[in-house]
Amino acid sequence: MDFINLNKVYPKDSYPLPKIDKLVDATAGYALLSFMDAFAGYHQIPLCPKVQEKTAFITDCGLHYHRVMSFSLRNAGATYQRLVNKLFEPLIGQTMEVYVGDMIVKSTVEEDHSSDLQKTFEILRAFNIKLNLKKYVFGVR
């Protein structure tokens, strides 16, 4: 789907993405790290009806529109980052770092890692966020 024209007229969301080098630095010195990736992260965010209308397209079967965010929408990255920052706010900087759909759970003490992961999974479950089962690594030293 080509959203070039829609992206031209839609105002840019200037919500900042985290700096990768700062995220890497924020994981230094931890006993255990776990890496996870949201499964088709953008497609897990429903679009409001007003925005859905703007994504309409015609096929042989009639008029259709996107019900979930598309990767190619101008503000997809900023919207997703704002969402995960809000959802994981109590954990970010403490036991977790998030860059769009990529999540790192970090523990200073190995014995706390299961508990730190559990808190993350509880939030993921509460908001029905699915993980990519092909893109995860748990318990990296």
Cite the ranges covered by each PLM segment.
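Retroelement reverse transcriptase polymerase core
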Residues: 1-141
